[in-house]
Amino acid sequence: MKPKLMYQELKVPAEEPANELPMNEIEAWKAAEKKARWVLLVLILAVVGFGALMTQLFLWEYGDLHLFGPNQRPAPCYDPCEAVLVESIPEGLDFPNASTGNPSTSQAWLGLLAGAHSSLDIASFYWTLTNNDTHTQEPSAQQGEEVLRQLQTLAPKGVNVRIAVSKPSGPQPQADLQALLQSGAQVRMVDMQKLTHGVLHTKFWVVDQTHFYLGSANMDWRSLTQVKELGVVMYNCSCLARDLTKIFEAYWFLGQAGSSIPSTWPRFYDTRYNQETPMEICLNGTPALAYLASAPPPLCPSGRTPDLKALLNVVDNARSFIYVAVMNYLPTLEFSHPHRFWPAIDDGLRRATYERGVKVRLLISCWGHSEPSMRAFLLSLAALRDNHTHSDIQVKLFVVPADEAQARIPYARVNHNKYMVTERATYIGTSNWSGNYFTETAGTSLLVTQNGRGGLRSQLEAIFLRDWDSPYSHDLDTSADSVGNACRLL
């Protein structure tokens, strides 16, 4: 018999009411939470954006060399760079068999001045754009005088004009610089004699940090009409122009009173572009590699290739030919006392022709101020041309003729070129080829490697061959009577 069970429903105790928030307070809390999340997001974005901005400003101001390892190539430059070779051909110097000539230096300078909008930086040796220094009425000075007039118009139009010039060691005309100061330009004299026992021999312009001129021409009226000069104008090439501005900024810094060369240059002056990592550019529509070198070595901040190293690299990498056109060639420290033998370039040229069979041609200037000791060194180089050594090296002297009136113009009628061209590379500099110009004197060079015909390299080669084959080039054994009294080396 089953026991009778009694079932009774158990009563679950009622839950005590929770401390619930009113609906309006819940909504307010959710809104506040959402707002806090948005504020936090905005703060995070602001911090990230500020960090990115400061990084960009730092890189723009101080350079980004430190971000790249020794084997990392910096990003290419996408500017449509255009290079134009410009020349000053002295009055009365004709090349009847030459094709259409290059633009003149004065045309190029006036064009750069006409296009300047914000800034013009000029690094220069000395200034005499009028012929007041000669106390003559020379009509060919008009081009230099026009350049000076146009320069004086820039600062009143809002263009920031800065001029770095070598401090003279003795009396020197200052009228041009005084006129430019009065027009609103800024001028600083760099005492290279105190700093390195040299001079500021550089010759370049930078316009709007976009275009520049670099070459052999001084700020001298004779450099436009009475002296043979060669340079290059780079248009629409801000990457290279900004890098050249860094070299100018070093001069500008050293032009301050009491300045000295830093033991370590601040990063502001550093560059990423050099012999090891040249700038990749599009030059006249074709790919090219380019960089700027500087002298002397104490004026080379981190990343900057010294001028001598750059020059020797071009010589050492030539496999077919080396053509050199330079005013002075001396394997000595000619301005040191006592004189010292300095065979750095001489050894490189001898090695190139003897070891690699490179064809070497030197076109050296000869005029009334040539150093007589050059002849012995040039004869020594020329003596390597021998059937037993199979060395192919030749030396010629370029003499600019002068009539009676032209001969009276002081420091004129000379080939002042300073360039080298090989089958691979172009070197356009501002220095003569003797030791002190690379060890003590401030100079700058542009180096370009470019393949193909029709480029800057082939144009410079054509100019050299035009001059080499001209009636103004003479072998070292030429009779002095055939060139008059214009040359001291025959």
Swiss-Prot record:
Which residue stretches are annotated as topological domain Cytoplasmic? 1-38
User: Which consequence is recorded for altering K228R?
Assistant: Decreases exonuclease activity toward CpG-free or CpG-rich ssDNA substrates. Increases mitophagy rate. No effect on protein maturation or trafficking to lysosomes
Question: What mutagenesis or variant effect is reported for T426A?
Answer: No effect on protein maturation or trafficking to lysosomes; displays differential exonuclease activity depending on ssDNA sequence, showing increased activity toward ATP6 CpG-rich ssDNA sequence and normal activity toward ND4L CpG-rich ssDNA sequence; increases mitophagy rate
Listed GO cellular component terms?
A: early endosome membrane; endoplasmic reticulum membrane; extracellular exosome; Golgi membrane; late endosome membrane; lysosomal lumen; lysosomal membrane
Transmembrane stretches in the record are 39-59
User: What outcome follows a substitution of E423D?
Assistant: No effect on (S,S)-BMP synthase activity, protein expression or localization to lysosomes
UniProt-annotated glycosylation sites, renumbered to this chain: N97, N132, N236, N284, N387
Name it: 5'-3' exonuclease PLD3
